[in-house]
Amino acid sequence: MDIEHVLNTHGIGATGLRTFDKKPPLAVLGFDATASGGSVVLSWTNPDDSDFAGVRIQRKIGSYPVDYGDGITVYKGKNSMFVDDSIDMNARYYYRAFTYDFNGNYNKSDTMRSVARIENLEKVYGVDIDQSNPDPFTAVTYVGEAVGLTPGSAIIDAIYPFNRIRPVLLNSEGEAVSELNKNNFNLTAQGGTANLNSRHNVMIEFPKLWIKMETVGDVIQIRFASSKIDETYKCLAHMKGNEEKDVFYLGAYLSSYNSGMLKSWSGYRPATALTIAEHRNMARLNGEGYGLVSFYQWLYIQILFIFKYKSINSQAALGLGYTNTSDRNANVSGTTNAKGMYYGSQTDNKERVKFLGLEDAYGNYATFLDGILLSPTYEMLTATMDFNAFGTGYELSPTNIASSLNGFISKTHGTTTQGFLPKEVKGSSAGCYGDRAMLFSNNPFTCGGAFTESSSVGMFYLNSLYGAS
């Protein structure tokens, strides 16, 4: 039951007093419904009206809702965009928006209508990366459904899986109990104040994606889709052993040490000087399913970075990250809370980066990467569960690495299972990836890179030099 509606239709306003206001607020402008990747992206501009309290969006199949009580309510609030993903394929959905005020008056203007057709036609997006091309931007080419996209544009955020990625508060049972405002994590999606450093962890939710990655000559071919196209497409980031998960979560911040466990909280210094085993164990204390970033989850993020910016040099595409070597004090988390889902500066090395809501995706401090090891003979060992220091139970795959590597990445293996594991390095950061790799056998991995490594850090930085396990 809509209690607010019941009260207001009986003449009781927001203050609990009888009101004689019968005039609804102005209509929204530019109401649009666009089908994208098995969902519908609804967008509009809210009216500049002091009487405006929110917008209610109704959905029907076959015809437009005749009133705000007709059909299914898919959204109610003050945002200007909503992704409707509770839909079926092969249907035409009719949407109608109704603005309302604090006294229950609804605007029923016919201008606030739109329709979207959802077809069972799987779209495959992708990029090709020519590793022989030293230019990190022109080395990347959009292919498939991605042809014609503008790198870095908001249009990309309407494509699956970008349109389903969201910041949330996650409880100890692994349940998202509140969605945060993508533009400002200090607020909930409904506009209330969010508690970012108390009971729940601040996490980013990532939906399942099917990925195919192979190398032909010097060209890495990456394709992804919202469903399994054929047996060559894998959803390894969403696998836990043999079980597929619909989503996975990563901490929005570098982990901090609180109450005897690792937390993803705003306003705290990152936990440092701990081994990967200590990090792993303290993360698990949060509840069932908690752990560290895994290799295949990070590969998922790397692929989306390339797709978003059409570049394999993250510092050139997004920002330097916190790489100011004159200040050795780790910055507290949350300084990018009000900076949306993406942020970076290409001139100021004291500014943090943020990608898909992940603060310090690189820079500030490196992040342990679980589920990957190199054997004494440099075979690659990977797993999607039961992570440990010895690679017990991990899958082994041969690599093109014969001994340790230390330098700037020029070529990677470029397969679905080996991802961007480097296979060739050079002495200069100029061209291609621009990130450093330090690969040694039997040691735990870190990714991203720390502030002390300056221009070496980035989305493809990889380090297994240090032996603390």
Predicted regions mapped to residue ranges:
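Enriched but not universal
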Residues: 1-23
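Pro/Thr/Ser/Gly-rich low-complexity, intrinsically disordered linker/stalk tracts
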Residues: 17-53, 89, 103-119
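Solvent-exposed loop/turn segments flanking beta-strands in beta-repeat/beta-sandwich domains
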Residues: 45-70
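Short S/T/G- and acidic-enriched coil/turn segments that sit immediately N-terminal to beta-strands
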Residues: 78-83
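Beta-strand-rich modules
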Residues: 84-106
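N-terminal module-boundary/linker segments of secreted carbohydrate-active enzymes
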Residues: 119-231
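C-terminal, surface-exposed recognition/capping segments
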Residues: 123-125, 297-299, 320-338, 345-348, ...
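Short aromatic-cysteine micro-motif
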Residues: 193, 197-200, 227-361, 365
